[in-house]
UniProtKB/Swiss-Prot annotation:
Residues 65-161 form the Rieske domain. The lineage of its organism: Bacteria, Bacillati, Cyanobacteriota, Cyanophyceae, Synechococcales. Component of the cytochrome b6-f complex, which mediates electron transfer between photosystem II (PSII) and photosystem I (PSI), cyclic electron flow around PSI, and state transitions. Its cofactor is [2Fe-2S] cluster. This is Cytochrome b6-f complex iron-sulfur subunit.
Length: 178
């Protein structure tokens, strides 16, 4: 058996190797733990190049304009998954087209999902009775604010929901949700 010369032997000692191994493992674990945190603050967007989020049905399938209008009539307000997966109402206007805005269905009082009451022609919160008109403006408390607005755009038959940052047309104030 031949012996290696001192030039052929690596210069890293056992202690240095264990320190490097420990540091590498700790770094890997820390980065792995930080990934979900970073993903929470910077979620991936579903949607087209316009920066919107694809509106999705209850099964998570993207909604198309033609498919939606085939099953929803004028005046209809139905829930979809909108921005950040929040329940959002798509509104079919009097002309039979999807409206230019949607309404976040989360009550501004305690966060309950507010259903549309077609008989009363308004949104009525089941938790504490807050009421909102057809455009989501609060008309009876205890909810302090109107429902949040979202832009609804159609791109290549896909229904996209986008952040609303302009003045709230219902109150002529800056949006509280932006």
């Amino acid at each position: 058996m031949t012996q290696l010369s001192s030039n052929d032997v690596p210069s890293m000692g056992r202690r240095q190797f264990m320190n490097l191994l420990t540091f590498g493992t700790a770094t890997g674990v820390a980065l792995g733990a930080l990934y979900p945190v970073a993903n929470y603050f910077m979620p991936l967007r579903a949607g087209g190049g316009g920066g919107g989020t694809s509106a999705k049905d209850e099964l998570g399938n993207p909604i198309t304009k033609t498919g939606w209008l085939a099953t929803h009539q004028a005046g209809d307000r139905s829930l979809v998954q909108g921005l950040k997966g929040d329940p959002t109402y798509l509104i079919v206007n009097e002309v039979g087209e999807i409206g230019e805005f949607g309404l976040n269905a989360i009550c501004t009082h305690l966060g309950c999902v507010v259903p549309w009451d077609s008989g009363a022609n308004k949104f009525i919160c089941p938790c504490h009775g807050s009421q909102y008109d057809t455009n989501g403006k609060v008309v009876r408390g205890p909810a302090p604010l109107s429902l949040a607005l979202a832009h609804v755009d159609i791109e290549d038959d896909a229904v996209l929901v986008k952040q609303w940052s302009e003045t709230d047309f219902r109150t002529n104030e800056n949006p509280w949700w932006a």
